């Protein structure tokens, strides 16, 4: 028997999601073969439900018995007066999983309506349309690289994403307790090369994905680093490649735009690696409230997010293509 409240999401985000989703599956599926596993999940449904005291017992079955209602009221008032306490109250008093206080995206931000990403639904939305490809390459291919394909349609942004690591890094990710085998099995990650990712694998994925869903990619956003080979090949195919400036003024509007779309449920994606990277994102904030993503934080990879942001840059930097990309 194991009892736990929610907590802050650190490097074990993906592992937590595996067990939480397993619990949800067992609860909802009467025909589950897991007869010796009985999950009991007490949580409030949404953050907004905290405003009504009658909802508090959902996450606190011992309220009025062990836990005092007066203490709960005091904590909620403290949270409203001091936003810095919000994450702690949400996790410890309402059993909502939250990201670390320094992270740019909240756990609630990155959730996607499961009906939007059912098999065939996401793919159906992006089929036979225009889109943007983008990628983020690691230093010499020695660690994770990522690519995204973005499609704007019906006021929403749809994203397909894949990541690659060299075989030499496989054990490192396993040691971090990440469900890397599940990611690979489900096609969200692939091993490429022995000590360095082979960039032609990324290039081929872009071509294959566009062919599979009849997507016409007219633009590509990317980081200049180590990109010469891939950019040349894409440009030879008539794709306009635009390097995103990795600066605070360059990154800040992209991060705010992505967060706004997520909070408005208009950014649709199905990659658990992209979710992990979003939750890993920590930012530096300047006096103008511009934000800049911190890179090279051990165990907090953000490559899938960066690849996606470069696609946002291509959209933003080429408004003349908006008519094509919205159809």
Indicate where each model-derived feature is located.
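Non-catalytic, compositionally simple segments
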Residues: 1-132, 141-143, 162-166, 173-194
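Short His-Asn-centered micro-motif
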Residues: 4, 221-224, 244
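A short acidic (Asp/Glu
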Residues: 11-16, 142-146, 228-236, 253-256
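Metal-dependent DNA phosphodiester-chemistry modules and their immediately adjacent helices/loops
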Residues: 25-55, 233, 237-322
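Long, compositionally biased intrinsically disordered regions
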Residues: 64-76, 127-128, 157-160, 203, ...
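Acidic, metal-ligating active-site segments
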Residues: 141-155, 304, 310-311
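Nucleic-acid-processing active sites and adjacent nucleic-acid-binding tracks
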Residues: 151-217
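Short glycine-rich phosphate-binding loop at a beta-alpha junction
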Residues: 215-226, 231
